[in-house]
Amino acid sequence: MNNGRIVRINGPLVVADNMKNAQMYEVVEVGEPRLIGEITRIEGDRAFIQVYEDTSGIKPNEPVYRTGAPLSIELGPGLIGKIFDGLQRPLDSIKELTKSPFIARGIKVPSVDRKTKWHFIPKVKKGDKIEGGDIIGIVNETPLVEHRILVPPYVHGTLKEIVAEGDYTVEDPIAVVDMNGDEVPIKLMQRWPVRIPRPFREKLEPTEPLLTGTRVLDTIFPIAKGGTAAIPGPFGSGKTVTLQSLAKWSAAKIVIYVGCGERGNEMTDELRQFPSLKDPWTGRPLLERTILVANTSNMPVAAREASIYVGITMAEYFRDQGYDTLLVADSTSRWAEALRDLGGRMEEMPAEEGFPSYLPSRLAEYYERAGRVKTVGKPERFGSVTVASAVSPPGGDFTEPVTSQTLRFVKVFWPLDVSLAQARHYPAINWLQGFSAYVDLVANWWNTNVDPKWREMRDMMVRTLIREDELRQIVRLVGPESLAEKDKLVLETARLIKEAFLKQNAYDDIDAFSSPQKQARVMRLIYLFNTHASRLVERGIPTKKIVDSMGQLLPEIIRSKAAIKNDELNKYDELERKLISVFENLEKEAGT
C-alpha cells in the first residue's frame, strides 16, 4: 500500500498526493507524529484529509501513512463507566501513559483494556448453527449491566469450538465458527466502522415512553423509547442542565453522554457529579450504566464529527444486546460549525449562513439511527436508541439553518425560552412552541399503567395553558378584572399548572426526579381543582371566592412537589380529601 505525501496544510485540513486507490473515509496517519485523519474527498491521486488532532508543526512533504480501514471503534466489555475522547481513546489511560493532564498528539491507546480478565459464561454449545447477532455468552460487566457477547453481524455458520466458563481477556478467542470452510475466531471484543449503521431485523413503532423524571418532558411533551428530540435554546437558558437531568434520571438501561464542542468546565461538572450520584431506578452508582465522551471546545474541531458517530455506534451496540439506550449530545450545533469550517477550507460551495449544502443529509443520517428495533440474532429481543440533542442557535434564533433543519427530522421539540429562564422558571421549556409526535403512541401506556384519566388530564392542562396565553394580551390592556369569571379561573388554573407541575428544581433531592405515579397525583389535584371550580363558576360563584376559600391549600399543593417523596404518595390522599371538602362546603353555600 503506497504512502502519500503532504502538499498543503490548512488548519485541520491536509491535502496529500500519491494517494492512488485510496478509499473515501479511509483512516490515514498524517505526518511524522502519525496524527489520525480521515479522507473526505478524492480528486485524482490527491486526497483531502480531515485531521482529528492539532496539525501545528506538520510540514509539506511529510508522509501520509494509509491504513486501508475506515474509522472504527472497539466494542466489548470495559466500555461502561469509562470516559473517552472524541476518538474513543480512554482519558485515564492517556493520563497514565503521558503523566500529563493534556492529550499528546498521535498517541495510540486501546479503547478497551487488553489486560483485564472478564468472567465469561457461554450460552451456546459446540455444533450449534449460529448467525450474526446471536448471543453466545454473557459477562457481568457491572452490577447493573449484563454484557451480552454477540456474534459479529456478518458471521454465520456452525460453532466449531466454544471455551468453558472462565476468565478471559478481550483478545482471547472464545469461539471458532466454521463459515463456508473458513475458521472465523470470535473474541469478547469486536470492531465496527462508525459511519455504517449496525443492522437490525425490523424497525418498530415506539409505544413505550422513556421516563425522565422531569414532569414537563414526561407529560406535556413525552418522548418514546427509540424517539428523537431536540433541545434548542440560547446561551443561559438551561440546555446543559436539562440534558444532564436526562442523562442522570432517565429510565434507559445505558446512557451515553457526548459533550460535543461544549465548554470544558461543563464536562468537568459531569465527571465530578456522576461518580457520587445514585441511579433512582436501582439505587446503584450512576456510572455503572453510563459512558461519557468528552470532546470539548478546545479540542480540534474535526473530532466533533467523530465523537457524534462514536457515541451513536456504541448506543447501537448496546441496543443490539436488547437494551434501551439513550444518547445525549451537547450540542449538534458545534458539530455543524465544524462541518462549516471544514467545508470552507475545502472550498465547497456554501449554502445558507455558510453551512455546507449537505448539512440536512448529515443530520438525517444521524437521527435516522435512532429507533426501536427487533434485533438480528437469537434469542429474539428488542432494543432501542433514543437520541436527545441540544442545538445552540446564536441569539436564540430558531430560524437559523441547524435548528430549522433539525426540526425536519425530530419528533419531539423542547424549545428553551430565555424569558422563562430569566423569570427563574426551570426547566425553561416553552409550552406553546414545543411539540411531541409521540403523545398518541404513549397515551395507552400511561392510561394502562399509571392513571386511566392521564390523557384527559394532560389535554386539560395543555388547553388551559393555550387559553391563558390568548387571555394574556387582554389582561395587559385592561387588567384581569374585566375578564369573565370562567376566564379568571383559566388564569388561576394556569398559575397552578405552572407553579405546581411545570416548574422543577433539578438541584433539589426530592424534586429532581418525579416518578410517573407522583406526576399523575399532582395532575389529578389540578384536574380536580379545575373541574369542581368550573362547576361552581357556572353556578355564579366568583373565582376569587373559590381561591380565598382554599386558604393555604393551593400553596400546599404547590409545595408538595418538593415535600412529598416518590414513595410517600399516600400523603396526596390527604390533600385530595382537603380539596374535595372545600368544594363540598362551597357547593352547599351555592345551593342555599
Swiss-Prot record:
<keyword id="KW-0066">ATP synthesis</keyword>
<dbReference type="InterPro" id="IPR000194">
    <property type="entry name" value="ATPase_F1/V1/A1_a/bsu_nucl-bd"/>
</dbReference>
<comment type="function">
    <text>Component of the A-type ATP synthase that produces ATP from ADP in the presence of a proton gradient across the membrane. The A chain is the catalytic subunit.</text>
</comment>
<dbReference type="InterPro" id="IPR005726">
    <property type="entry name" value="ATP_synth_asu_arc"/>
</dbReference>
<dbReference type="InterPro" id="IPR024034">
    <property type="entry name" value="ATPase_F1/V1_b/a_C"/>
</dbReference>
<keyword id="KW-1003">Cell membrane</keyword>
<protein>
    <recommendedName>
        <fullName>A-type ATP synthase subunit A</fullName>
        <ecNumber>7.1.2.2</ecNumber>
    </recommendedName>
</protein>
<dbReference type="InterPro" id="IPR022878">
    <property type="entry name" value="V-ATPase_asu"/>
</dbReference>
<comment type="similarity">
    <text>Belongs to the ATPase alpha/beta chains family.</text>
</comment>
<dbReference type="InterPro" id="IPR004100">
    <property type="entry name" value="ATPase_F1/V1/A1_a/bsu_N"/>
</dbReference>
<dbReference type="GO" id="GO:0005524">
    <property type="term" value="F:ATP binding"/>
</dbReference>
<keyword id="KW-0406">Ion transport</keyword>
<dbReference type="Pfam" id="PF22919">
    <property type="entry name" value="ATP-synt_VA_C"/>
</dbReference>
<dbReference type="InterPro" id="IPR003593">
    <property type="entry name" value="AAA+_ATPase"/>
</dbReference>
<feature type="binding site">
    <location>
        <begin position="233"/>
        <end position="240"/>
    </location>
    <ligand>
        <name>ATP</name>
    </ligand>
</feature>
<keyword id="KW-0547">Nucleotide-binding</keyword>
<dbReference type="Pfam" id="PF00006">
    <property type="entry name" value="ATP-synt_ab"/>
</dbReference>
<comment type="subunit">
    <text>Has multiple subunits with at least A(3), B(3), C, D, E, F, H, I and proteolipid K(x).</text>
</comment>
<dbReference type="InterPro" id="IPR031686">
    <property type="entry name" value="ATP-synth_a_Xtn"/>
</dbReference>
<dbReference type="Pfam" id="PF16886">
    <property type="entry name" value="ATP-synt_ab_Xtn"/>
</dbReference>
<keyword id="KW-0067">ATP-binding</keyword>
<keyword id="KW-0375">Hydrogen ion transport</keyword>
<dbReference type="InterPro" id="IPR023366">
    <property type="entry name" value="ATP_synth_asu-like_sf"/>
</dbReference>
<keyword id="KW-0472">Membrane</keyword>
<dbReference type="InterPro" id="IPR027417">
    <property type="entry name" value="P-loop_NTPase"/>
</dbReference>
<keyword id="KW-0813">Transport</keyword>
<dbReference type="GO" id="GO:0046961">
    <property type="term" value="F:proton-transporting ATPase activity, rotational mechanism"/>
</dbReference>
<keyword id="KW-1278">Translocase</keyword>
<dbReference type="GO" id="GO:0005886">
    <property type="term" value="C:plasma membrane"/>
</dbReference>
<dbReference type="GO" id="GO:0033178">
    <property type="term" value="C:proton-transporting two-sector ATPase complex, catalytic domain"/>
</dbReference>
<dbReference type="InterPro" id="IPR036121">
    <property type="entry name" value="ATPase_F1/V1/A1_a/bsu_N_sf"/>
</dbReference>
<dbReference type="GO" id="GO:0042777">
    <property type="term" value="P:proton motive force-driven plasma membrane ATP synthesis"/>
</dbReference>
<dbReference type="GO" id="GO:0046933">
    <property type="term" value="F:proton-transporting ATP synthase activity, rotational mechanism"/>
</dbReference>
<dbReference type="InterPro" id="IPR055190">
    <property type="entry name" value="ATP-synt_VA_C"/>
</dbReference>
<dbReference type="Pfam" id="PF02874">
    <property type="entry name" value="ATP-synt_ab_N"/>
</dbReference>
<dbReference type="GO" id="GO:0016887">
    <property type="term" value="F:ATP hydrolysis activity"/>
</dbReference>
